[in-house]
């Protein structure tokens, strides 16, 4: 599920006047929220608005937990609205900021928040997180307004740290639910090859599920020899592939401060050249090159030309990686593993999926009510468990692993057939130490788009001067990023 990000140059052209207007509204724009000495007033009614992208099934879950939240805070009315997809949320909010009509809370990706921060529309959460103010709830219980250290530690670190990816060491978001990339593979085929290898000792059947890129190359080579008409691997996102390689190789990609676009370097040019060779050998294709999600190749029958045996795609799209079930069951079982690594002892996988940001308001009680609701959704084990089971996204707190229903009725039933969603989430939870997020700034979405186009261009170019072509492609990508960022 790939985000379609509009060109930042057009977006900024549309928004330039918007931000000038926003800076002149009655509400003074400050990102650092100051908690009033009186704290949160539980006796005065307050209404907050939440923009998201949830379908009906997830809205039903949200509604149930708003009821639970209101048992604690009956004075807070939560109005929530589905606003299309992620980019639709961003586009509507950037328009509303101009007249001070933005919501209180919104689904967000880091590049969205970087845009909102141009108008200082979102607040930093640091003072709220650190607050030791005590709030008395309607049932007589109390809670600390801020996050306890145990609550902070419960977040999957890579997900939590996304909130500080803006270059100023301030926290602007909390994670709600996440996805990542995983390696889907035809487990039935791999098991059959393993059986043949055990029976014959023929090395051509020694085909292993790869854990490193070097192993992946060898696996692709052997699969191509066994099935010359196949494309062993499909990789959905060229952008994710490039960015993940930068992270795994500790090679510069972008920076939130100073010179932003750092990806034109020898290390990065070399891995693009290597993967171009894979493409030229017929080992791999991508979504843009193949003309659609590579799951369509992965779910093909092995007898069909152009089928694949591996696919790297979103963990949240697991059901799309499963072949159609027939009268005799599924044509093959799907296995799921962590994407290949440069160093298996220092794994890096991309973190994606929605976080929550809070917008500044002249009424501090709206901000406090918004914070209490965000805190409730992100730290409530029951909500995180149910939301994950319904959505197929990964919960953001580790304690969900100990939730009895989640563990016994979801994770423990994980398989590569009917329960493939649970298997995908399970793999996502097992790699909790590996998540990374890229720096967010004005132009970060342009960088993402351009490196994806760069990969596509370098893979498909017909030239004898490969190094020269790749060098030019990198230079043009950086130039386009700088142009779009202004």
Task: Locate the predicted segments by residue.
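Hinge/lid segment of periplasmic solute-binding proteins
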Residues: 35-36, 90, 111-182, 245-246, ...
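Extracytoplasmic/periplasmic substrate-binding proteins
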Residues: 53, 63-66, 115, 239-251, ...
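Conserved C-terminal helix/tail region of periplasmic/extracytoplasmic solute-binding proteins
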Residues: 367, 414-416, 424-486
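Extracytoplasmic "Venus flytrap"/periplasmic binding protein-like
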Residues: 68-154, 192-193, 302, 309-310, ...
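Short, well-ordered beta-strand elements
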Residues: 44-55, 76-81, 105
């Amino acid at each position: 599920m790939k985000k379609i990000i509009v060109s930042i140059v057009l977006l900024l052209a549309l928004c330039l006047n918007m931000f000038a207007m926003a800076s002149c509204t009655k509400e003074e724009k400050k990102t650092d929220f100051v908690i009033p000495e009186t704290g949160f007033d539980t006796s005065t009614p307050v209404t907050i608005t939440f923009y998201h992208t949830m379908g009906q099934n997830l809205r039903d879950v949200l509604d149930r937990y708003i009821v639970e939240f209101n048992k604690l805070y009956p004075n807070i009315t939560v109005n929530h609205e589905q606003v299309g997809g992620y980019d639709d949320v961003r586009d509507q909010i950037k328009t509303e900021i101009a007249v001070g009509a933005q919501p209180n809370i919104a689904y967000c990706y880091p590049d969205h928040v970087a845009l909102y921060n141009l108008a200082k529309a979102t607040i930093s959460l640091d003072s709220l997180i650190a607050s030791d103010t005590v709030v008395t709830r309607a049932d007589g219980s109390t809670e600390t307004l801020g996050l306890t250290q145990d609550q902070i530690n419960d977040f999957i670190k890579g997900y939590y740290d996304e909130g500080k990816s803006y270059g100023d060491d301030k926290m602007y978001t909390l994670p709600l639910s996440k996805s990542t990339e995983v390696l889907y593979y035809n487990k039935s085929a791999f098991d059959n090859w393993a059986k043949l290898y055990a029976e014959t000792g023929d090395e051509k059947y020694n085909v292993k599920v790869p854990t490193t890129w070097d192993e992946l190359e060898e696996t692709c080579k052997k699969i191509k020899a066994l099935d010359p008409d196949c494309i062993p691997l499909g990789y959905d996102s060229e952008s994710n592939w490039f960015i993940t390689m930068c992270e795994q190789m500790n090679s510069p990609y972008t920076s939130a401060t100073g010179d932003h676009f750092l990806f034109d370097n020898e290390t990065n040019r070399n891995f693009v050249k290597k993967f171009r060779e894979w493409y030229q050998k017929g080992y791999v294709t991508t979504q843009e090159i193949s003309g659609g999600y590579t799951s369509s190749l992965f779910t093909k029958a092995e007898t069909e030309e152009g089928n694949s045996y591996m696919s790297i795609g979103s963990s949240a799209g697991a059901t799309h990686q499963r072949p159609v079930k027939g009268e005799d069951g599924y044509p093959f079982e799907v296995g799921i593993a962590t994407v290949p690594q440069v160093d298996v002892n220092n794994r890096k996988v991309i973190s994606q999926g929605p976080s929550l940001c809070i917008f500044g308001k002249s009424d501090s009680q709206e901000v406090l009510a918004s914070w209490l609701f965000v805190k409730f959704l992100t730290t409530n084990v029951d909500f995180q468990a149910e939301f994950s089971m319904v959505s197929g996204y990964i919960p953001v707190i580790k304690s969900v692993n100990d939730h009895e229903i989640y563990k016994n009725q979801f994770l423990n039933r994980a398989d590569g057939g009917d329960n493939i969603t649970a298997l995908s989430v399970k793999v996502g939870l097992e790699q909790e130490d590996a998540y990374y997020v890229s720096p967010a700034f004005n132009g970060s979405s342009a960088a993402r788009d351009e490196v994806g186009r760069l990969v596509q261009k370098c893979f498909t170019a017909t030239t004898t001067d490969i190094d020269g072509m790749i060098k030019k492609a990198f230079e043009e990508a950086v130039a386009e990023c700088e142009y779009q960022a202004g």
